[in-house]
């Protein structure tokens, strides 16, 4: 796939390479275990490094579903990245909100889909309710498809 430098993509990890990918997909009844933004060169979000980061990485289309966003949110993504750079992964929030359903999460830590959905909703106001910490990668995919953003 040829990526355009002025475009932003949302990418969803669909491979079962790691055991936790299989577990997440099973637990969330989803096709995807992870999501991030991609600018054609860098992944932007929170992932294996357990912190918000930008990482130069080519994508294997057999492992990722890649969708061009038809809205321009490149600047908001980079602004939110600057605001949250280095923020850690919210493991406790996963346990308290998604496993035990206590609806607790950290205000300064994120899951991949929480980080992505925060930006999407700040700009487009399309996510209801605003419980970003409970949103899965599959939820984001379905919201973006429903609103014809991908």
Name each model feature, range by range:
Residues 20-21, 86-89, 132, 137:
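Generic secondary-structure boundary/loop-capping signal
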Residues 97-150:
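Activation targets extended, charge/polar-rich intrinsically disordered C-terminal tails
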Residues 9-69, 96-107:
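Glycine-rich catalytic cores of cysteine/serine-nucleophile enzymes that process amide/ester linkages
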Residues 72-76, 111-114:
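Generic recognition of short, well-ordered alpha-helical interface segments
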Residues 1-8, 141:
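Protein maturation boundaries and topogenic segments
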Residues 73-95:
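A structural motif
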